From Swiss-Prot:
Keywords linked to the UniProt accession: ATP-binding, Cytoplasm, Magnesium, Metal-binding, Nucleotide-binding, One-carbon metabolism, Potassium, Transferase
Subunit structure: Homotetramer; dimer of dimers.
Localization annotation: Cytoplasm
CC cofactor: Mg(2+); K(+)
UniProt binding sites for L-methionine: E56, Q99, D239, K270
The protein, known as: S-adenosylmethionine synthase
Binding-site list for ATP: H15, D164, A165, K166, R230, F231, D239, R245, K246, A262, K266
Organism: Salmonella dublin (strain CT_02021853)
CDD domains documented for this protein: S-AdoMet_synt
Function comment: Catalyzes the formation of S-adenosylmethionine (AdoMet) from methionine and ATP. The overall synthetic reaction is composed of two sequential steps, AdoMet formation and the subsequent tripolyphosphate hydrolysis which occurs prior to release of AdoMet from the enzyme.
Length: 384
């Protein structure tokens, strides 16, 4: 492969779509804490002064959706009306129904291992050895920039920062290997009284330089810090937010394909979420085992059917064993039936709110990031 550029973006926890994702997953977590077998599909809409939480939830649990919503918005940092959104005074509306019994009869089974998929669909998982977390570098560093923005906002280092922010990083590749960073974009909401020059200097020193490796930066690297010159109006006052609208930010930043299904607000019976996590787990273990430098997994399902309708392994010419052998290894070591992958990754716990900002992949505390099958795969493949 010749020289090329590749760009990924991320958004902060205060971005309107991410507020919605975090509320949906906070509701999911609260329900799973009481009822691990609950069926949850929770969607959220946010706009100036209001939050609407809707969807289909079937559970024995009772949760206070208004309190969960306000606490989530408060933790993000929207606590004053001058930000255009206030956790203490915003309206919280609820429109929750129950899961269709037609769907339910296709999912539940007397034998849990025969649990059917909650819907048809296709999901992808990906891993690459270009970073220590086996994720693409562009999305990894885009996430780290907005995470750092939240950190220095909350710890008081840059008290004039506000919750809404976006990042974008363009990497230079030569023959598939990173040779540098071509461009960095960071836009952050801010208080009215900070001037542009002071903001740009502070963002460079406190956010960008501590995060991006200096060996990838050079005199030709371009930096765009609040390029419009002003970002006071942000969050839900600037744009409405919806659950599930940042699916590329949530996954691989465009480096891998995406099946189209969003994650947040969905319990693990929804393969949109759980099978995408399992596909990442498979791909990461294949790369960690040294069986390939890059690996993309596709799985697909039919509603009400336990066995996947297809499994694909793509290694982009980087495989160390034949592709046919990789498929056999995946089938041998990973149970990709809906209940099997729930058990394999221990998914019936309230672990989802943390996934809802800064990416679902590449953070070691999530169970689908374990590489506990890597040595087994390596041994079975006959690699020394």
């Amino acid at each position: 492969m010749a020289k090329h550029l590749f760009t990924s973006e991320s958004v902060s926890e205060g971005h309107p779509d991410k507020i919605a994702d975090q509320i949906s997953d906070a509701v999911l977590d609260a329900i799973l804490q009481q009822d691990p077998k609950a069926r949850v599909a929770c969607e959220t809409y946010v706009k100036t002064g209001m939050v609407l939480v809707g969807g289909e939830i079937t559970t024995s649990a009772w949760v206070d959706i208004e309190e969960i919503t306000r606490n989530t918005v408060r933790e993000i940092g929207y606590v004053h009306s001058d930000m255009g959104f206030d956790a203490n005074s915003c309206a919280v509306l609820s429109a929750i129904g129950k899961q269709s019994p037609d769907i339910n009869q296709g999912v539940d089974r007397a034998d849990p291992l025969e649990q059917g998929a909650g819907d048809q669909g296709l999901m992808f998982g990906y891993a690459t050895n270009e970073t220590d977390v086996l994720m693409p570098a562009p999305i990894t560093y885009a996430h780290r920039l907005v995470q750092r923005q939240a950190e220095v906002r909350k710890n008081g280092t840059l008290p004039w920062l506000r919750p809404d922010a976006k990042s974008q990083v363009t990497f230079q590749y030569d023959d598939g290997k990173i040779v540098g960073i071509d461009a960095v974009v960071l836009s952050t909401q801010h208080a009215e009284d900070i001037d542009q020059k002071s903001l740009q200097e502070a963002v460079m020193e406190e956010i960008i330089k501590p995060i991006l490796p200096s060996e990838w930066l050079n005199t030709s690297t371009k930096f765009f810090i609040n390029p419009t010159g002003r970002f006071v109006i942000g969050g839900p006052m600037g744009d409405c937010g919806l659950t599930g609208r940042k699916i590329i930010v949530d996954t691989y930043g465009g480096m891998a394909r995406h099946g189209g299904g969003a994650f947040s607000g969905k319990d693990p019976s929804k393969v949109d979420r759980s099978a995408a996590y399992a596909a990442r787990y498979v791909a990461k273990n294949i790369v960690a085992a040294g069986l390939a430098d890059r690996c993309e997994i596709q799985v697909s399902y039919a509603i009400g059917v336990a066995e996947p309708t297809s499994i694909m392994v793509e290694t982009f010419g980087t495989e160390k064993v034949p592709a046919e052998q990789l498929i056999l290894l995946v089938r041998e070591f990973f149970d990709l039936r809906p209940y099997g992958l729930i058990q394999m990754l221990d998914l019936l716990h309230p672990i989802y709110k943390e996934t809802a900002a800064y990416g679902h992949f590449g953070r070691e505390n999530f169970p689908w990031e374990k590489i506990d099958k890597a040595q087994l795969l390596r041994d079975a493949a006959g690699l020394k």
